[in-house]
Amino acid sequence: MQLTNKKIVVTGVSSGIGAETARVLRSHGATVIGVDRNMPSLTLDAFVQADLSHPEGIDKAISQLPEKIDGLCNIAGVPGTADPQLVANVNYLGLKYLTEAVLSRIQPGGSIVNVSSVLGAEWPARLQLHKELGSVVGFSEGQAWLKQNPVAPEFCYQYFKEALIVWSQVQAQEWFMRTSVRMNCIAPGPVFTPILNEFVTMLGQERTQADAHRIKRPAYADEVAAVIAFMCAEESRWINGINIPVDGGLASTYV
């Protein structure tokens, strides 16, 4: 993968998929600026400690990022067992706010990679709602929209992964045509990460056991990270506006 001298920002860098993505990117010559609320235990070229759940924390992080970058990997996220407002803020509103704010810093030919989920696969059932939310400009404005269009707490994780997929696909081509910056989603299935058990709790034993029979095993974080890194590389320069499942075939079993 051609990543030498590319300067890439990775959120959620201190654990799981984010940490593995940073390792893969650096192994291929990229310069990695990590962002996380927790201190990392891996080697990075730079690190910004930040809380991405509110605009003030995001603005503080942005002020410490380079003026020119080549990519943004939005990997920070919280499971559906977290407070529903936190899920909305981190997994969607904050991600969108950060991405829109740093777009002007991403150089032509750059790439944005958003980590969605196979749990967002039912986005067509709520397409118009997701498009409407995606058109809302601003973090607090998004919160206001959600107050008018509340999401059931037990469904919030799936809902905001759906919303992320729709926003990414709707927005990607307009940005690419105007700035030559691509945006795509990577949709993991179950992954061996520190929060895997949280997803088991969120989905329940019945759904978890049903899905377990559909795949050989959960993914290892580096298997997802390799695809994220590829989407930042020159070799993927003509891929834009798609959502790529990295799930060992899980999504295909629902066809």
UniProtKB/Swiss-Prot annotation:
Molecular functions per Gene Ontology: coniferyl-alcohol dehydrogenase activity
UniProt catalytic activity: (E)-coniferol + NADP(+) = (E)-coniferaldehyde + NADPH + H(+)
Pfam families: adh_short (PF00106), adh_short_C2 (PF13561)
EC number: 1.1.1.194
SUPFAM superfamilies with a match to the protein in the record: NAD(P)-binding Rossmann-fold domains
Entry superkingdom: Bacteria
Known function: Catalyzes the conversion of coniferyl alcohol into coniferyl aldehyde in the eugenol degradation pathway. Specific for coniferyl alcohol; does not act on cinnamyl alcohol, 4-coumaryl alcohol or sinapyl alcohol.
Name this polypeptide is given: Coniferyl-alcohol dehydrogenase
